[in-house]
């Protein structure tokens, strides 16, 4: 069932039919059989026309032009042909008819079959939904990964976020505040006393000049009267109330609470501390103190706008001089402001009017207070009497809505703030106490469709619209009573007419202008339920405004809490996956509202009553007919029996094939048929038409000659189909086919001339294959060996001796006459192949004569490429551990196969991998290329067992010093300082979650997981990250498993000398769990290094394009040195000393952020590094050995670690060749040095090198590090031109040119694997064209690539296609040199 479902979802290919079509088989069976026969000879195939879904086959008439004698006459004739109907992608129901002559399927008017249409549409919808589901899963996986990374970065940044900074005060505010305090104190100590002079001496005017004796005279004032009333109240209270010291103290100090100076001090201090601009309030307080406005000014401030506030300042200054004039001035200022600001809008003008009235009232009230000498608390009580009635309505309300000038609610405030509860945090305590510690849900992601909204401009306002089907939809109140509105979409403006107003709903449907055909159409939600809803509208500046909330259905409306801005009415309300729910309408402050839009809201076409009655009658008849359509006739019953027998025969054939390994259809009878066909024998022609059909065609006007020609054409089509069936089933059983006539049925089912057993067995007699001379030597074992066949006990019992003699002879031939997959010199290949073929035929014929199926008739048991791993039982989680291989390991064999003598053989594991590889692919596509330049010095790597022993030499050259740090402390210290400075940006790096690491998941998952899964991607798809997480926790907890590495040799283009010497590179690959553990520690650092290639030495992650190569060479030249060095090692990875590699790894751990440098992480990382240096390696032979040297070439950070080591070596080398310099001098001169580094490749500029630099560094690397540097690999020059880096040579204009063009040619004409098609070959040559662009036009490689591209382009065009891409010189210049700055 799983296989059928999978094939149904994929497009039908050649020879593969959709499972729905195979099962349902709609239409005429004879038409179906005939249709597939015609499809084989047709120029266009049904599999290309219908990608999936059931097909309906039927016979029908087709009018064609009459052709006679090669002349087309304008007369149409009618022929009988096959009509095929189905549903294409996009839910288009189409019908195609086969047209003779052109032999192709041509589209005709559709012949609708309801069942085919219904199932076809469902299949197309299922395919689309399946594609959407896969895409959604991919996006979900990507989003989860991004969320994990962002969460990790967020947690790290939160820890690094500094605390809140202390607020600083402006100098001007501090100075003015000091002035305010001084002024306030001066005003507080100032007092006025009125009295009468008692001295008798008077001057001429009757007034004493100096009064030494006087008495105070208390004039009447409100202050004195209220003070006396207050004292009387206190005296009365003292006589009747019980004695209370606290109460006496409170009543005694009560007047001071209403004191102006205390209030001014508190207000001023609060503004200086908390306000951003306190000067405005300080100015007001100073002027209020000066003018005696005092508390009246504070009460008036909340009701003043900017003009009236300035008016208050002016009035208070005048009030201090003359109170009566100040009252007049306040009136004049208010009138002047009201006249000057007449142009304001109503809202602002109303605020100004209120401010002016407040200004005049405050001035008059201040004059009364001053005149009556009223105390401060009297002023406070008067102000409270004014304000309390205004807020009574607010006190009893639950909330306060603040509306804007347009009447819409801008803000809603809670009228019950409960400040104490809020500040105490009691509510938060309960929330924290009952909140779950683990988050159980996430906010949903939403699907937003950009550029899908239009703007509706009507007379009464503006709104939003969107497309549904072929209508524009908006809110009814946006359009109003208009019948035509203006519509804008991006830069396209058009007009739309009202088509339909939905009854009882505020929804209007408009016509869709022709210019908006590409506007996205919203699809209706299948059901409308409560849940998350999304409102998308046009925001300011054309940007999308998105609101997300929880919606609740109320009748035919939905409410949600989303604020509404101008122009949002008519916006679509959708689900999180973009399905339409309704049309947005209004905002009520707390909730938004939308009208639900359903499928029934579209205008429904009214059907004629007669048509409706007929449809009801047809439905009733079809329902009644369904009970009578099962095998109603004898032909149906016979058909059912034949179909059942066909299925049973297919099952039996498959079971027999699987059980006995029977080869498919290679019989003597079959070869007779094919031989007869090749010799020109013809079978008896069958009937094309029945007698009734033939007479009908004659009556329609066809002549006998025309019908004879049509019959011959039909028979030729049948022959083509049968030939195809013969080819397709040449290695298979004959397929089931319907009989052509009743006579065949009678003969096959009831005839008496049945073959005997002996005549049937004679069909299986082996025949000698005359053509074996083309067999390649590397294919001898595959062609003639018996190990690919199932051999039973009966075979061994009767033919064991013959089989042994045959296999011994075959092994002797292979060992004696072949070497490394090629014939030995002076070998008569023709005689050897004939001899092997004769022995093969003799063995098979002997078995046939004794009644046993020969090997020629048995199926080879070759392993197939599976989409999944081998069949197995349920997996035990312990089998996924890193050290499970130790439980599987058996003791080693007595001898050695692939392990060198100086390496131990620890044990043996069961593994089935090839050891030798002598395959040199022969790609027929290469015959399309013109003759290539000579590249015989290179070829594809091939190897035998000796190559594995040779590959271990990469770890051996010379012995390094026991302690380099101890023997060379000065050089070691300087190298460590350079390392720290060069990679200072690694400080603060982090450890990533193992599930968030990135790695090539298409790589092998090593042993033993490779027994079950081919790649890590397959392993992850089945097991997920559960094994990764559990193993990470186990190791972090203290486990230290031994890790197994799988070794294989690399298939690549090498020099022929290396291939002949079996010098092939080895690659080791560890378990993906181990790789991702290391990646968790190092991926962040690796990413940081890839982003610093422009300014730092390591170049992993760089690009030579867009002037990248030239800029880096210019960076070296900018040091203004005269020494440039091209430096390369031999066996670099394998000979890196353990001491250096351990130092590099220790440095990397020290660069982690402090919170990650825990003891547990350090111990885990140390285990990881130890496993890199002490490796248990599995050979393809099953042998397990141990490697303890070098940087493994398959670990996750091989290149990055090589870069770090290269920087260390270079700094050590620089100090070594300058022994006369101190550490400080070395640091100074190092600033003038620079390098480009990629693994073991290095291009350096030094300020100075000694004359014997090459010899000194060659001996230094050998004696100190035990590494191999060949003198010819160290090139010293005074210019970078001519030196090479990363396979490029620096050209005269500092642009890169390929260094080894012969190797590129060899990889083209002698590739390591075959290419898929001619387009892939064209693309490969195009890559060479790009690489060789900077070569001179006369260069042989560049001229060849240009010619090859043109030749391949012509071939592609001759095949009816077009070359994938055409690259011009200008484009290549831009690619290499970059665009304009």
Swiss-Prot record:
Record site: Cleavage: 195-196, 436-437, 662-663, 665-666, 752-753, 867-868
Residue spans crossing the bilayer: 169-189, 249-269, 279-299, 324-344, 365-385
Record PROSITE patterns: RDRP_SSRNA_POS (PS50507)
Record flagged with keyword ATP-binding: yes
Active site positions, chain numbering: 477, 506, 569
Key word Ion transport present: no
Reaction equations catalysed: RNA(n) + a ribonucleoside 5'-triphosphate = RNA(n+1) + diphosphate
GO annotations of cellular component type: host cell membrane; membrane
Record-listed O-(5'-phospho-RNA)-tyrosine modification sites: 694
CDD domains, per database record: ps-ssRNAv_Astroviridae_RdRp
Source species, domain of life: Viruses
PTM text: Cleaved by the viral and host proteases. The protease is probably autocatalytically cleaved.
BP-aspect Gene Ontology terms: DNA-templated transcription; proteolysis; viral RNA genome replication; viral translational frameshifting
Keywords carried by this UniProt record: ATP-binding, Coiled coil, Covalent protein-RNA linkage, Host membrane, Hydrolase, Membrane, Nucleotide-binding, Nucleotidyltransferase, Phosphoprotein, Protease, RNA-directed RNA polymerase, Serine protease, Transferase, Transmembrane, Transmembrane helix, Viral RNA replication
EC nos: 3.4.21.-, 2.7.7.48
GO molecular function, one term: serine-type peptidase activity
Domain RdRp catalytic residue range list: 1122-1254
Family indicated by similarity: Belongs to the astroviridae polyprotein 1AB family.
Protein name from the UniProt record: Non-structural polyprotein 1AB
Gene: ORF1
């Amino acid at each position: 069932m799983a296989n059928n479902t999978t094939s149904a979802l994929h497009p039908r290919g050649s020879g593969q039919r959709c499972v729905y079509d195979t099962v349902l088989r709609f239409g005429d069976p004879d038409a179906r059989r005939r249709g597939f026969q015609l499809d084989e000879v047709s120029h266009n195939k049904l599999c290309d026309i219908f990608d999936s879904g059931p097909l309906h086959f039927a016979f029908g008439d087709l009018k064609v032009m009459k052709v006679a004698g090669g002349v087309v006459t304008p007369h149409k004739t009618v022929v009988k042909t096959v009509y095929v109907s189905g549903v294409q992608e996009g839910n288009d129901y189409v019908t195609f008819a086969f047209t003779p002559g052109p032999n192709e399927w041509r589209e005709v008017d559709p012949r609708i079959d309801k069942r085919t249409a219904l199932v076809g549409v469902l299949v197309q919808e299922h395919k689309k939904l399946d594609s959407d589901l896969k895409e959604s899963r991919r996006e979900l996986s990507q989003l989860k990964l991004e969320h994990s990374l962002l969460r990790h970065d967020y947690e790290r940044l939160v820890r690094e976020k500094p605390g809140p900074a202390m607020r600083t005060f402006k100098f001007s505010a501090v100075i003015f505040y000091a002035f305010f305090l001084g002024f306030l104190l001066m005003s507080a100590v100032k007092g006025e006393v009125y009295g009468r002079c008692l001295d008798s001496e008077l001057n001429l005017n009757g007034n004493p000049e100096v009064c030494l004796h006087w008495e105070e005279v208390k004039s009447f004032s409100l202050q004195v009267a209220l003070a006396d009333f207050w004292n009387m109240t206190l005296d009365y209270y003292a006589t009747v109330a019980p004695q209370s010291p606290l109460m006496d103290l409170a009543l005694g100090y009560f007047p001071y609470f209403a004191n102006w100076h205390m209030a001014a001090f508190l207000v001023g201090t609060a503004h200086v501390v908390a306000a951003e601009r306190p000067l405005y309030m300080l100015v007001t307080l100073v002027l209020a103190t000066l003018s005696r406005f005092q508390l009246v000014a504070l009460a008036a401030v909340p009701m003043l706008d900017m003009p009236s506030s300035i008016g208050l300042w002016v009035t208070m200054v005048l009030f201090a001089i003359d109170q009566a004039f100040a009252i007049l001035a306040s009136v004049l200022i208010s009138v002047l402001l009201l006249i000057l600001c007449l142009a304001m809008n109503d809202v602002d003008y109303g605020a100004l009017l209120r401010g002016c009235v407040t200004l005049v009232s405050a001035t008059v009230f201040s004059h009364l207070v001053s005149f009556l000498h009223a105390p401060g608390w009297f002023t406070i009580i008067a102000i409270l009497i004014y304000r309390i009635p205004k807020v009574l309505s607010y006190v009893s309300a639950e909330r306060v809505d603040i509306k804007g000038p347009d009447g819409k609610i801008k803000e809603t405030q809670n009228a019950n703030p409960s400040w104490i509860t809020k500040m105490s945090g009691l509510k938060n305590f309960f929330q924290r106490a009952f909140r779950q510690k683990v988050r159980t849900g996430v906010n949903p992601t939403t699907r937003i469709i950009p550029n899908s909204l239009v703007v509706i401009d009507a007379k009464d306002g503006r709104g939003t619209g969107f497309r549904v089907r072929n209508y524009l939809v908006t809110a009814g109140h946006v359009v109003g009573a208009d019948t035509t509105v203006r519509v804008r979409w991006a830069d396209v403006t058009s007009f739309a007419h009202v088509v339909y107003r939905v009854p009882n709903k505020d929804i209007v449907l408009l016509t869709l202008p022709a210019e908006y055909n590409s506007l996205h159409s919203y699809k209706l939600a299948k059901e409308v339920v409560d849940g998350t809803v999304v409102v998308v509208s046009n925001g300011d500046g054309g940007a999308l405004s998105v609101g997300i909330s929880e919606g609740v259905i109320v009748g035919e409306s939905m409410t949600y809490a989303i604020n509404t801005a101008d122009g949002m009415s008519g916006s679509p309300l959708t689900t999180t996956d973009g399905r339409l729910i309704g049309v947005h309408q209004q905002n009520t402050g707390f909730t938004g509202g939308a009208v639900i839009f359903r499928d029934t809201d579209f205008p429904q076409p009214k059907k004629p009553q007669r048509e409706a009655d007929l449809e009801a009658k047809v439905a009733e008849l079809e329902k009644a007919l369904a009970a009578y359509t099962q095998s109603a006739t004898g032909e149906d019953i016979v058909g059912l029996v034949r179909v059942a027998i066909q299925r049973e025969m297919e099952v039996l054939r498959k079971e027999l094939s699987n059980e006995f390994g029977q080869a498919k259809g290679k019989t003597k009878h079959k070869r007779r048929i094919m031989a007869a066909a090749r010799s020109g024998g013809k079978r008896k022609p069958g009937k094309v038409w029945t007698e009734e059909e033939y007479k009908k065609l004659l009556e329609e006007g066809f002549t006998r000659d025309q019908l004879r020609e049509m019959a011959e054409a039909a028979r030729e089509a049948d022959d083509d189909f049968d030939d195809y069936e013969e080819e397709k089933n040449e290695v298979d059983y004959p397929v089931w086919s319907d009989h052509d006539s009743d006579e065949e049925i009678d003969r096959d089912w009831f005839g008496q001339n049945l073959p005997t057993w002996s005549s049937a067995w004679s069909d299986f007699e082996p025949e000698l294959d005359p053509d074996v001379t083309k067999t390649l030597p590397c294919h001898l074992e595959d062609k003639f060996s018996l190990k690919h066949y199932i051999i039973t006990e009966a075979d061994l019992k009767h033919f064991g001796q013959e089989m042994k003699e045959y296999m011994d002879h075959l092994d002797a031939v292979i060992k004696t006459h072949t070497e490394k997959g090629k014939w030995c010199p002076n070998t008569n290949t023709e005689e050897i192949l004939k001899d092997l073929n004769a022995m093969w035929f003799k063995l098979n014929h002997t078995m046939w004569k004794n009644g046993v199926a020969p090997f020629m008739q048995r199926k080879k048991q070759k392993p197939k490429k599976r989409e999944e791993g081998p069949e197995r039982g349920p997996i035990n989680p312990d089998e996924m551990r890193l050290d499970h291989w130790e439980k599987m390991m058996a003791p080693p064999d007595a001898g050695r196969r692939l392990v060198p003598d100086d390496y131990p053989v620890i044990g043996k594991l069961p593994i089935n991998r090839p050891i030798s590889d002598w395959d040199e692919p022969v790609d027929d596509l290469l015959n399309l290329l013109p003759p290539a330049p000579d590249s015989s010095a290179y070829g594809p790597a091939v190897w035998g067992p000796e190559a594995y022993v040779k590959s271990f030499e990469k770890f051996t050259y010379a012995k390094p010093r026991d302690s380099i740090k101890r023997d060379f402390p000065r050089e070691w210290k300087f190298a460590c300082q350079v390392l720290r400075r060069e990679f200072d940006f690694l400080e603060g790096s982090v450890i990533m979650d193992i599930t968030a690491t990135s790695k090539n998941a298409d790589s092998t998952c090593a042993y033993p997981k490779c027994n079950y899964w081919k790649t890590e991607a397959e392993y992850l798809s089945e097991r997920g990250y559960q094994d990764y997480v559990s193993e990470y926790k186990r190791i972090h907890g203290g486990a230290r498993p031994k890790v197994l590495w799988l070794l294989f040799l690399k298939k690549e283009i090498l020099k022929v000398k290396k291939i002949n010497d079996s010098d092939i590179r080895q690659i080791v690959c560890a378990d993906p769990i181990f790789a991702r553990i290391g990646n968790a520690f190092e991926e962040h650092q690796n990413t940081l290094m890839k982003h610093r290639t422009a300014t730092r030495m390591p170049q992993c992650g760089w690009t030579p394009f867009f002037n990248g190569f030239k800029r880096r060479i210019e960076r070296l030249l900018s040091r203004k040195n005269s020494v440039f060095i091209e430096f390369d090692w031999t066996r670099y990875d394998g000979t890196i000393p353990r001491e250096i590699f351990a130092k590099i790894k220790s440095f990397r751990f020290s660069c982690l952020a402090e919170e990650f440098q825990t003891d547990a992480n350090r111990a885990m990382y140390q285990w990881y590094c130890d496993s890199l240096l002490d490796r248990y390696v599995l050979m393809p032979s099953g042998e397990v050995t141990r490697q303890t040297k070098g940087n493994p070439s398959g670990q996750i950070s091989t290149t990055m670690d090589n870069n770090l080591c290269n920087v260390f070596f270079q700094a050590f080398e620089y100090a070594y060749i300058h022994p006369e310099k101190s550490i400080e001098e070395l640091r100074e001169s190092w600033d003038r040095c620079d390098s480009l580094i990629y693994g073991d490749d290095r291009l350096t500029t030094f300020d100075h090198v000694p004359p014997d630099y090459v010899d000194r560094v060659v001996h230094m690397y050998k004696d100190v590090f035990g590494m191999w540097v060949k003198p010819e690999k160290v090139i010293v020059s005074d210019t970078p031109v001519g030196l090479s880096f990363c396979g490029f040579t620096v050209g005269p204009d500092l642009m890169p040119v390929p260094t080894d063009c012969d190797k590129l040619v060899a990889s083209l004409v002698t590739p390591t694997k075959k290419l898929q098609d001619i387009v892939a070959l064209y693309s490969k040559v195009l890559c060479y064209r790009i690489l060789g662009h900077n070569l001179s036009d006369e260069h042989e490689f560049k001229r060849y690539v240009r010619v090859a591209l043109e030749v391949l382009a012509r071939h592609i065009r001759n095949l009816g296609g077009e070359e994938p891409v055409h690259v011009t010189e200008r484009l290549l210049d831009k690619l290499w040199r970059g665009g304009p700055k």
